[in-house]
Regions:
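Glycine-rich phosphate/diphosphate-binding loop of Rossmann-like nucleotide-binding domains
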Residues: 6-23, 28-32, 157-210
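N-terminal beta-loop-helix "entrance" segment that forms/cooperates
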Residues: 33-57
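N-terminal glycine-rich phosphate/adenylate-binding segment common to multiple enzyme folds
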Residues: 49-161
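Short, ordered loop/turn segments at secondary-structure junctions
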Residues: 10-12, 43, 74, 114, ...
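Generic secondary-structure signature for well-ordered alpha-helical cores
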Residues: 26, 30-34, 65-68, 101-108, ...
Length: 212
């Protein structure tokens, strides 16, 4: 198998962990006769230092042309890094949001598995830790608060911040379907977490989820 992998080393510990991940991929190539080529893509603080913005159109094009993208970490110390003297839309994390949107990466999969060797370090109740767990947590990435309108303004002499939470039925339906598809390969159980007793967006989420 031949693959071109976009490599985003990113910031902070990113270059270090990406270098180790590439060693693993290279070993996979050796063992299974695959061929991986790598294209470096700048994102976040590294892109700000090089180009003055957290993500360039060229970087988005490079990521889209890749078969997969390997990413380290994005951002730095908000107290000391000059990146955080910039307005929010030009900070490292803004580039990450742009990349998610540009690649349509709407579903974030986060497995949580408790291995026997780590049960003693688990902060959950012993009866839960003893049983162990194997969860797949899915988070929606391209809608909602992160991509809604936001503002901070003074109203009647008081600073007031606003963040708009918006989802449409198509955004909800596609991530619900992805959740169901994954569940069919596991234990065939899906739990949707919402706040439908208060939020309109959660009521729509529950309605579309049930209908899907």
């Amino acid at each position: 198998m031949d693959m071109n992998i976009g490599v985003i080393k990113g910031d902070g510990i990113g270059p270090e962990i990406v270098a180790e991940a590439k060693k693993v991929l290279d070993r996979v190539c050796e063992k299974y006769s695959h061929k991986f080529s790598y294209t470096e893509v700048l994102l976040g603080g590294a892109s700000i230092d090089a180009h003055g913005i957290p993500l360039t159109e060229e970087a988005i094009a490079q990521a889209k042309a890749s078969d997969a993208v390997l990413m380290g970490s994005i951002g730095g110390d908000a107290k000391t890094s000059p990146w955080y003297q910039l307005e929010p839309s030009k900070r490292p994390e803004a580039g990450l949001l742009q990349l998610r949107k540009g690649l349509n990466l709407f579903a974030n999969l986060r497995p949580a598995v408790l291995y026997d060797e780590l049960k003693g370090a688990c902060p959950l109740k012993k009866e839960i830790a003893d049983r162990g767990f194997d969860l797949m947590i899915m988070r929606e990435l391209t809608g909602g608060l992160y991509f809604g309108k936001r503002s901070t303004e003074e109203i009647d002499g008081v600073l007031t911040a606003k963040d708009e939470l918006t989802y449409n039925e198509n955004e909800i339906r596609r991530i619900a379907k992805r959740g169901f598809d994954i569940a069919m390969k596991r234990r065939k159980k899906v739990t949707s977490v919402d706040k439908a007793n208060v939020l309109d967006s959660s009521r729509l989420w529950r309605k579309i989820g049930r209908a899907s």
